């Protein structure tokens, strides 16, 4: 039986968000498999589950096309090292977790060697560069999607796919109670709090930090009672943000915390965030939000003409309509963002928005880790029988 068989499962997570997803899947797979080795590239959460990382996850961290071009030689060498390892010692299955440009190239090579390949977290082919769906069809045996519209897209293009839901929707309660958390951060129940999330990578903070600091400055002038809390993903990013803060905004009363972005959003009245997973978390926490994002000039010039969706914020994409204000590139300016944040801070009734957030939450709450593990086990059983 597969449960007792010695198995080797290779995985690559290129970012910390993928590390969290990978850890959940490993944890669930260990409930079903008694003799299994997990190896590849993972972060601290995967390592806690017994994962053996051949490369430090930070070596894969890139943002934007210019960063990819600059780092390409290093990324190429890492990919070739992994492929050599798995050619000599083939895994029973390879699972690429997000990080599509890197992982799809690995998957394509491994599949040619008759190694089963699974991609967890759909590349945003439904949003831009849709022709990639043909590469995905050749490279993977199964795509595990976090959102229902992604599964529908793949099935329309003849790609094997399964919607598993989102692990965050399982983790966060439908009706979260966050009032007790305010005491932890020395806030009172009647304080007005704006959580500001400029990003979790150097490149993101480089572009979003100054913009969001200027927005906070404007809000502090117009609403002096508003408190600001800024979670910074890790200690390595502190110098980047504090350099921006001390340059012009030292007088602002901002509580900067390490990590705990979810708690910062949970205790807030409104969230200001860059696009990405944080918008999903804010929605699951039922927090009104404003979303903004800016690329570098080169990245924007290449990507913008290829974008095929009307929204960038996940709540808007999932709803199929504009639930929350979002601003991209030149529209992501201080005036527009400040006005939207103030409107939300001044609004006393968000019941309809919260109801729509709750409906989406229920759709995404599917016990994702278990569904992913069972899908992986089916692939393994098919390949080993």
UniProtKB/Swiss-Prot annotation:
<keyword id="KW-0808">Transferase</keyword>
<keyword id="KW-0444">Lipid biosynthesis</keyword>
<dbReference type="GO" id="GO:0016020">
    <property type="term" value="C:membrane"/>
</dbReference>
<protein>
    <recommendedName>
        <fullName>Lipid-A-disaccharide synthase 2</fullName>
        <ecNumber>2.4.1.182</ecNumber>
    </recommendedName>
</protein>
<dbReference type="GO" id="GO:0009245">
    <property type="term" value="P:lipid A biosynthetic process"/>
</dbReference>
<dbReference type="Pfam" id="PF02684">
    <property type="entry name" value="LpxB"/>
</dbReference>
<keyword id="KW-0441">Lipid A biosynthesis</keyword>
<comment type="function">
    <text>Condensation of UDP-2,3-diacylglucosamine and 2,3-diacylglucosamine-1-phosphate to form lipid A disaccharide, a precursor of lipid A, a phosphorylated glycolipid that anchors the lipopolysaccharide to the outer membrane of the cell.</text>
</comment>
<comment type="pathway">
    <text>Bacterial outer membrane biogenesis; LPS lipid A biosynthesis.</text>
</comment>
<comment type="similarity">
    <text>Belongs to the LpxB family.</text>
</comment>
<dbReference type="GO" id="GO:0008915">
    <property type="term" value="F:lipid-A-disaccharide synthase activity"/>
</dbReference>
<keyword id="KW-0328">Glycosyltransferase</keyword>
<dbReference type="GO" id="GO:0005543">
    <property type="term" value="F:phospholipid binding"/>
</dbReference>
<dbReference type="InterPro" id="IPR003835">
    <property type="entry name" value="Glyco_trans_19"/>
</dbReference>
<keyword id="KW-0443">Lipid metabolism</keyword>
């Amino acid at each position: 039986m597969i449960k007792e068989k010695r198995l080797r499962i290779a995985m690559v997570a290129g970012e910390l968000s993928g590390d969290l997803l990978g850890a959940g899947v490993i944890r669930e797979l260990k409930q079903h498999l008694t003799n299994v080795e997990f190896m590849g590239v993972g972060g601290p959460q995967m390592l806690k589950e017994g994962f053996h990382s051949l490369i430090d996850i930070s070596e894969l961290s890139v943002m934007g096309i210019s960063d990819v071009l600059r780092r390409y030689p290093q990324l190429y060498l890492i990919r070739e090292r992994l492929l050599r390892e798995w050619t000599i010692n083939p895994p029973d299955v390879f699972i690429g977790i997000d990080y599509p440009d890197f992982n799809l190239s690995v998957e394509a090579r491994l599949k040619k060697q008759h190694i089963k390949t699974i991609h967890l977290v759909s590349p945003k082919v439904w949003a831009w560069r849709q022709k990639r769906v043909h590469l995905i069809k050749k490279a993977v045996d199964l795509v595990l999607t976090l959102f229902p519209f992604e599964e529908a897209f793949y099935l329309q293009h003849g790609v094997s796919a399964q919607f598993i839901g989102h692990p965050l929707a399982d983790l966060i309660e439908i009706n979260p109670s966050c009032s007790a958390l305010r005491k932890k951060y020395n806030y009172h129940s009647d304080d007005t709090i704006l959580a500001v999330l400029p990003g979790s990578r150097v490149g993101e903070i480089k572009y979003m930090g100054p913009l969001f600091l200027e927005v906070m400055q404007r809000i502090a002038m117009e609403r002096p009672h508003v408190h600001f809390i800024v979670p910074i993903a890790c200690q390595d990013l502190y110098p980047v943000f504090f350099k921006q803060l001390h340059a012009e905004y030292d007088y602002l009363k901002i509580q900067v915390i390490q990590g705990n972005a979810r708690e910062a959003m949970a205790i807030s009245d409104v969230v200001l965030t860059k696009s990405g997973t944080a918008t999903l978390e804010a929605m699951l926490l039922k927090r009104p939000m404003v979303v903004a994002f800016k690329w570098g000039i080169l990245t924007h010039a290449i990507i913008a003409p290829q974008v095929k969706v009307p929204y960038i914020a996940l709540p808007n994409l999932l709803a199929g309509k504009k639930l929350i204000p979002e601003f991209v590139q030149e529209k992501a300016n201080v005036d527009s963002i400040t006005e939207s944040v103030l409107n939300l801070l001044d609004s006393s009734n968000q019941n309809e928005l919260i109801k729509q957030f709750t409906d989406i939450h229920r759709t995404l709450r599917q016990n994702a880790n278990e569904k992913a593990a069972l899908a992986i086990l089916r692939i393994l059983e098919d390949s080993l029988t």
